[in-house]
Amino acid sequence: MTDQQSTGLTGNTELTDKQSAELSAEGVPQDALRRLAELRPGRPGGIFTSDLSVNEFLLVREAGFRPLGLVLGSSIYHVGLQVGRWGKNQELDVLSQAMYHARELAMTRMEAEADALGADGIVGVRLDVEMKEFGNDIAEFIAVGTAVKAEPGAGGGGVSDWRNNKRQPFTSDLSGQDFWTLIRAGYAPLGMVMGSCVYHVAHQKFGSKIGNIGKNVEIEQFTQALYDARELAMSRMQAEAEALHAEGIVGVQLRQHSHTWGSHTTEFFAIGTAVRPLRPDHIIERPTMVLTLDA
C-alpha cells in the first residue's frame, strides 16, 4: 500500500484544497469528498456513520476509540488473460498480480478516506470481490470499514501514536468484540496483511484416471498443487506483516475461489491482522469464568 502522510488537521472541519487534490489523485470521487467533509470531527451538527453492530460499537467505545465515519474504497478491475498448460501445475502470475493490485487499490482508497478524517485506524474492515455483469473478466473489489479516533487513555494510556510505521491509519478485519479483547490484552493492530496466488492445477492424464477407478489413492499432483498455492499465499501475507514490523498475525483466514476461471484455476487468498504489543511489559489478563444459569 502506498505511503501517505497524515492529512487530518485538528480543529479544521473542512477539507483543504491540498487534501482534496490528494484524495482525487488516489481515485476518490468528488461525491465522496463532499461526504467526508460533512463527517469531519468538530463540524456543527455533524454525525458519524458506522457499519458496526450495536454491541461492536459499544465495545469499540469501551476500548477508547471514537467512530468518525464509514470509509470505503472501490476498484472495478479488468483481470487479464493467462492460460495454464494442460498437464502442468503452475502459478498464473498475471492473474495473481491483477487480484493483488485491485485489492490494493481498494484498500489504499479506503485508507485515504480515513486519513482525511484524521482517523487513527479503521476497524471491522470487509474486503470483498464481486464479479460484474459487464463481463466475465471484470470484477469490483470493495473495502469498507469504520474509521476511528483514539481517545486520551485508549489502550490503558501511554500510547501516543496508533498509526503504523508507514504513517497510515491501522486497519483491522477483527470484529468489535475481538478488537476490544486485543486492546485489553495489550496489543494493537498495525494493518491488514494479505497474500494472493492464482494457480493452475494440472489435469490428470487419461491413463491415470483409468488406473485409479475403484481405488483409494492419493492424487499427488493435486495435493502438491494446492499445497504450493497455499504456501505462496501464506508467505506473501507473512512478508507484508514483516514489513510492518509486526509481532504476529491474528484472525488469519485462508480462502479459495475459482471465480470465473473454471475448476482447474483457483485463487488462494490469505488475510489477517498484523499486531504489535502496546508496551514491552504488557500482561495478558486472565479470563473471567462465567457460569450461566440457563437450563
Give the ranges of each region predicted by the language model.
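Intrinsic disorder/low-complexity detector
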Residues: T2-L95, I138-F222, T273-A295
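Short amphipathic alpha-helical surface micro-motifs
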Residues: F48-E56, L105-A106, G124-R126, F170-Q177, ...
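Short, well-ordered alpha-helical segments
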Residues: V71, I76, R85-R126, G207-Q253
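Hydrophobic, ordered structural segments
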Residues: A102-G156
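Short, conserved loop-to-beta-strand elements that form functional interface hotspots
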Residues: G121-E133, G248-T260, H282-L291
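C-terminal functional regions that serve as terminal interaction/effector modules
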Residues: V217-E220, A239-G248, V252-I283
